[in-house]
Amino acid sequence: MPAKYKLNDEQFFLLTYPTTPADFDGSGIVAILERLGCSYRVGRELHQDGKPHFHAMCCFDEPYSDGDARRTFTVGTRVPNIRVRRTRPERGWDYVGKHAGTKEGHYIVGEK
C-alpha cells in the first residue's frame, strides 16, 4: 500500500485513477463517494492507447479530514492520486467531464 495521504479540513479535491482495466466501471468510486455524503462527479476517459482512466471531483459542504485518504478511496487494487483544490472547484468539476459526450469512450459515470 502506498504511503498515507492526509486530508486536513479540505472541502474540494480531485481523485485520479490513472490506470484501470477495461472492465473497471467506476461504480466502486461512486459507492465510496455516496457513503461519504459529498457532491461528486465521476468521469471516464481513454488514454491515447485506448486504456481507460477515471477522475472524480469531490465537494464537501463542510471541511473533510482523513488520516489515510488513499486507503479510503482505494477501489479494489486501484489507488488514486489525490489533488486538493483550494480555489475554483468548478474547474475541477468541468475537468472531470471535459470530453463526455464528445469523444468515444468518454462519459460521466455518476454525478450528485
Give, region by region, the residue ranges found by the protein language model.
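Short coil/turn motifs at beta-sheet boundaries
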Residues: 8, 49-51
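Short, glycine- and small/hydrophobic-rich beta-strand elements in well-ordered beta-sheets
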Residues: 35-49
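A generic structural motif
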Residues: 51-60
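Catalytic "initiation/cleavage/transfer" segments centered on a nucleophilic residue
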Residues: 1-36, 61-112
